[in-house]
Amino acid sequence: MDQRLHSQSSGTHFSRLLSIIITRPAEHTMTDDEGTMSGNGSPYDGLLPRRETQALDFVTQHPRYDGRTVIIGILDTGIDPGAHGIRYMADGKTPKLIDMVDCTGSGDVDVSTEKRVEECEDDVELWQVKGLSGRTLKLKKSWWKATETDDKKERHESTTRDTGRTFPARPPALPKVRLGIKRAFELFPSAVVQRVKRHRQRRLDRETDAYVADVQRELTAWQEKFSAANNKKPTPEDLRHKEDCQARLDVLMDKEWETEDPGMILDCVVFHDGQDYRAVLYGGNDDLHDVNEELDQLIPLAAYRKERQYGTVSSVDQYNYAVNFHDDASVLSIVGDCTPHGTHVAGIAALADGPDRSGVAPGAQLISIKIGDSRLGSMETTSSICRGIMAAVRLGCDVINLSYGEGCQLPNSGRIVELAEEMVWRHNIMFVSAVGNNGPALSTVNAPGGMSTCIFGVAAYVSPEMMRPMYSITSNTDNEGENDDDNHVGTTYTWSSVGPTADGSLGVCVCAPGGAITSVSNWTMQKSMLMNGTSMASPHACGCVALLMSACKAEGIPISPPRIQRAIEN
C-alpha cells in the first residue's frame, strides 16, 4: 500500500513537472521586473542558442524560473571572476559567482614561514618586512583591524601579586605575517606567458638600445678626440678606455648570452587582520622598479566565498585570481584559470547579460571548481576530479557540469564513478557531462560522461539558426530564397561521439546545441569567443536542468536526478 501511494505521488510530481516543461513558443516579449529573457527575435539569436531546447520560451513564459535558487558547479579549467556577465547577476548587485576552489594544487603556495613586521622609518602609517625574494615589502597598518595585535590579550597594565604595585605594560608586539614565494609563469596560461615574455623582451630591448647608444657615443667621441685632424696620440689609459667601450658594445650586441625568461617572482604575504586571513601578492607589475610603488593598488584578499573580491596580477597579463587558505593558513591557494574553456562553459550555462545575450539559466549561481592542472597544460587528473566531486557536495551544488573526458577500457567502474554515484544517489546532485568529440564512429563515447549510468551524457547538435552566425553557412542547397533556413537540416555535429558502450548502455542521453559565442577570460583580450564541441553542449543541458530545478523548488516539487533526467528525455 505504501509503495503504491509512493508511486502515485511520484507520478503526480512527474506530471506536474511535465506540465511546466511543455511550453508554447513565445510570440511577444513578456516584461518582468526580474526577467532576463526576451521572446522577440534578436540579432544575437544563434550566438548563444537557446531556442533549440525551448529554454528561451520557457523563461519568457516563466520569468521566475530562470535558474534562481539553483547552484551550478562548473568542474573545468576555472572561471575568470572578471569576465563579462560572470561575477554578478543582471542587476549588477547580486553575486553570481559565489565561490572559487582549486582542486589541482597548481596554485598552492607554502606560507609556513613566519616573520614579525618592523616599523617603517619612511612612513609611520606603514610596516615593513623582508620577503622570501629578498625584497623589502611595505604593508599598510590600516589593513589590520584596530583591535588586532599578536598580544591583543595583554593588559595595558600589569600588577605584581606580591606587592600589588602597578607597572606600565610593555608596548604591544608588532603582528606576525606569513611569507611565501611563487613564480607568476606557474600560474599563467601559455598564451599569457608568451605575451608577458614579449612585453618583457621589448622593455629589455629598449633599455639595451639606450646602453648601446651611450657606448657608441663614447666611442664616437674617442675617435673624434684622437682623429688624424687633431694630431693627438692616445695614452695607455685612453687605449684601455677604448677597449672597455668596445668590449661593452660587443657584449650588448651579442645575443648568445640571452637565456630563458623565468618571469616575475611574486612575494606572497598572508596575515590575520583580527577577523579573517588575508593575502597580498607583490611583484606582479615588473614595470616598476620598486614593488611598493603600487601599494595603493594592492587589495588584501580574503577567501573568495567571504567577500567575493579578486585581484589582477598586472595590466599586461590581465590575469585575475582569487585566494583560499588551507591547513590553518599555512598554505595559500591562488585560484585562477588555465584556459578560457571554463569561463566559456560557465557563460553558456548561466551568463547574465541582458535579455538577448544571457546564458540558458541566467538566474543560477555558479561555483568554479578547477580540475584542469595549470602545470599539465589544463589536463585533469583522477585526484582533481575526485576532489572536485567532493567539493561540489561540500559546497551545496544542485547540479554540476563536467566538460572533460578521456577514453577508458571498463565502463561504469573506477573511483570517479564510485564518487559520482554517491553524489547522485545519496546527495541528489545531478551530474551532467560531455560524451566526447570522437565521432561519428560507434562506441566512441568518453569517460565519465558516456561511460557511467549515473551521469547525464550530452552529445552536440547544430541547428540551422546556428549555422549562419557561427559558421557563415547561408545554405546547404542551390535553392536560396527568403526561407533559407528551410534549406538547412539540424543534425548532430559529425565529430560528436556516439554510443553504445561496451556493456550495452546507450552512452548518450540527449543532444544539445554544441556551439556558442559567449564570454571568455579577460586575459585573452577578448570579450567573447566562438567555441564548439560537446564541451559546449553539456553546459547548455546543465542550464536546462537548472531551469527545471528552479521551477521544482518554486512549485514545491521534490527534486531527484532520475526525475529531472526522465522529464528531459521524454
Regions flagged by a language model, labelled:
Residues R308-Y319, S330, G449-A546, S550:
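Extracellular S/T/G-rich loop segment that most often corresponds to the catalytic His/Ser-adjacent loop
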Residues K370, N401-G405, V432-V435, A459-A460, ...:
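A cross-family glycoside hydrolase active-site/sugar-binding cleft signature
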Residues A83-M89, D110-S112, S413, T444, ...:
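Short, solvent-exposed loop/turn and secondary-structure capping segments
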Residues R387-V393, C408-S413, L419-R426, G439-A447, ...:
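Hydrophobic, small-residue-rich alpha-helical packing segments that form membrane-like cores
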Residues D76, G436, G533:
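Active-site glycine-centered loops adjacent to acidic/histidine catalytic or metal-binding residues
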Residues A346-A349, I367-D373, T444, G514-N570:
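Hydrolase catalytic cores
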Residues F58-D214, E218-A221, K225-D244, R248-L252, ...:
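Subtilisin-like serine protease catalytic core
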Residues G78-P81, C103-D108, D373-R375, G405-Q409, ...:
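Solvent-exposed loop/turn segments at secondary-structure junctions
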